[in-house]
């Protein structure tokens, strides 16, 4: 995916931002794992439930803290509860966003920012969900 220049410019006002642009998947996973905090923006379409993206699952699977900007009443919000040091904030809640980033920054400065795999994240992997789908299809009457 891509990130708009406006978003990069806004974040650059308060934190150091390094935009790698489009990279191949293996490099993307490596960059995710090497990051201290990952930020995921949820597409918000009124009247529709926010879907849980593969990208968010990949972010969570790194064990690194994840800040999600999106709907607090979505399935994503429920999923975020299993991810230690992670948070979800509304896009207009700049105080909560700032507080979260500052908290993660202070943990990083104190060398206390830890990666912790969310308990149960493996059930959201492509491998696991594909296996579950196969089991459902096999159980269907022919």
Residue positions per predicted region:
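Acidic donor-binding loop of glycosyltransferase active sites
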Residues: 16-17, 32-50
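A charged, aromatic-enriched C-terminal amphipathic alpha-helix characteristic of glycosyltransferases
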Residues: 92-96, 109-139
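Nucleotide-activated donor-binding/catalytic signature segment of Leloir-type glycosyltransferases, i.e.
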Residues: 4-29
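Short alpha-helical segment that forms part of, or immediately flanks, the ligand-binding pocket
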Residues: 29, 54-64, 77-78
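Short hydrophobic beta-strand element within catalytic cores of glycosyltransferases
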Residues: 37-40, 58-70
